[in-house]
Amino acid sequence: MTTMVSVRVLGISGSPRKGRNTEHLLRAALEAASKVEGVETELLRLSDYRVLPCDGCNLCVKKEGCPLDEEDDMGELKERLQEADAVIIAAPSYFSSVPGILKNLMDRSRPLKMGGHLLSGKVISALSVSALRSGGGEAVVEEILRFGLTHGMIVVGGCGDPLTQSWSGIGTLQGDAGWRRTSDDGIALRDSRGVGRRVAEVALTLKRGRL
């Protein structure tokens, strides 16, 4: 009898704004992931949590944990990251970088690395939104993926049509006829779905022990 394998894909919206452009792309990716048999998805908004900035105390290096966990919600977020088999992080471009709330999460995740690479082997991918076509979307994706590589995670991109589809979903609000929402950016939505589907497939393959 074949044992049913299931994986959990956690989508993290790193935008301070709820239900807006970044979340549209993330929902598209998670919807595509959920259509892969054996995959459960969950959307988490960082804007619902309080995460203080790292103060560089280095107690995590000494394996003493982070004292700030007692003052904010980072302890819960670390648990959610560890429970997931795969993570898709979506963020808008703020001056060609990630928003402060997401950077706080990245910096404060250091105890997970110092505690024994607790996120290693998990799948990660990234989505982004920028206002201008050259507004820093790719820089945001690269920053998120560097975060994953620092934790020893497995970076995955979409594998759609090699001539027309990108490996990542990057939305832009600047269209040919003026401004738009990502819900009207068909290319970004399509590419985001491709990312979600591929993340789900790779996470399942890894859990089944085929890689």
Regions found by a protein language model. Give the residues of each.
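N-terminal beta1-alpha1-beta2 submodule of the flavodoxin-like/Rossmannoid cofactor-binding fold
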Residues: 1-118, 164-211
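Short, glycine-/small-residue-rich phosphate/pyrophosphate-handling segment
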Residues: 100, 118-163
